[in-house]
A protein has these predicted regions:
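Short beta->alpha linker loops
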Residues: 62-63, 86, 198, 220
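Conserved beta-loop-beta/alpha segment of the NTase-like Rossmann-fold superfamily
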Residues: 67-151, 186
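Structural beta-sheet core signal
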Residues: 3-5, 58, 110, 133-134, ...
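Well-ordered alpha-helical segments embedded in enzymatic catalytic cores
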Residues: 40-44, 94-97, 201-202
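N-terminal glycine-rich phosphate-binding loop and ensuing alpha1 helix
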Residues: 1-68, 78-80, 85
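Short coil/turn segments at beta-strand junctions that form active-site/ligand-binding loops
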Residues: 1, 54, 105-107, 130, ...
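Catalytic-core segments of class I nucleotidyltransferases/pyrophosphorylases
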Residues: 124, 155-223, 228-251, 258
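A structural signal for short hydrophobic beta-strand segments in well-ordered beta-sheet cores
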Residues: 23, 147-151, 215
């Protein structure tokens, strides 16, 4: 199984920053009886590995070689690869930069490296043979990509990208699909003149053309670390929850707009 990690963005919400935002220290881990800072993107890699990934591809931009230097060619039980997005051109463009590595018979998971979410085994709840989204309930869905479901509470009918009135509190935090579907989506994106910056609008076109997607309500807590507010929230949530721990966060900051915990 492949994991794709789009990490080519400039991190404008955190500028000026002397290193890639995917390497922001959030929490810590113990290595050889010594605690060391943990880069925020390590949490996504660990979740991908727990979900079955044995190969992970970072999509990086020019000037972000520090990610390669930090991780090298291996992390946990997964081999790492790197491809380059020459200029920031949206999530769709970034993800499809890695498509040549993914065979139609592979399974692929995609997540955002500046987020932390629980449970850390959430990707295992998604099927391997269908396009499916790991959903999280949040208080401010207008800040994210809200996912509308059919009456069966399973099939996706629409993704509402950062709408002021999304009509649901459920957003996607990661998604998974067969490699064949990734290639179908790329073909559709090309047919649409590559105009889709966000995956949500492309998925809506895919659904309109007869495609199928599932939304799995298995997420419990979600933090966007890409803002200072979210960064503080993640530090609070992870202060007693190191990477690799199965424990759920027990506290949440009332100040944090981007931390969401469901009990």
């Amino acid at each position: 199984m492949w994991g794709i990690v789009p990490a080519a963005g400039r991190g404008s919400r955190f500028q000026p920053l002397a290193f890639s935002k995917e390497l922001l220290p959030v929490g810590s881990r113990t290595l050889n009886d010594t605690q060391r800072p943990c880069a925020v993107s390590e949490y996504l890699l660990e979740r991908m590995i727990r979900g079955g990934a044995d190969k992970i591809c970072f999509v990086i931009g020019a000037g972000k070689s520090d990610i390669l230097e930090y991780f090298g060619g291996h992390f946990g039980g997964a081999d790492l690869a790197y491809v380059v997005q020459p200029r920031p051109a949206g999530l769709c463009d970034a993800v499809f930069r890695a498509r040549a590595l993914v065979a139609p018979g592979d399974t692929v998971a995609i997540g955002l490296p500046d987020t932390v979410w629980f449970p850390d085994h959430g990707l295992a709840a998604l099927p391997d043979d269908k396009l499916s989204f790991l959903l999280f309930p949040v208080q401010r869905p207008e800040q994210f990509d809200a996912v509308m479901l059919a009456d069966d509470e399973l099939h996706v009918t629409e993704i509402r990208v950062k709408r002021p009135d999304p009509g649901t509190h459920w957003i996607w935090g990661a998604f998974k699909m067969p490699g064949a579907v990734l290639h179908e989506l790329h073909q559709l994106w090309q047919q649409r003149n590559e105009r889709d910056e966000y995956f949500g609008t492309l998925i809506n076109a895919y659904l309109a053309s007869g495609g199928e997607a599932l939304g799995i309500k298995a997420g419990e807590a979600y933090v966007d670390v890409g803002t200072l507010q979210g960064y503080r929230a993640a530090m609070l949530m992870l202060s007693d929850t190191p990477p690799g721990s199965e424990a759920m966060p027990t506290t949440a900051s009332s100040e944090a707009a981007s931390i969401e915990v469901r009990t």
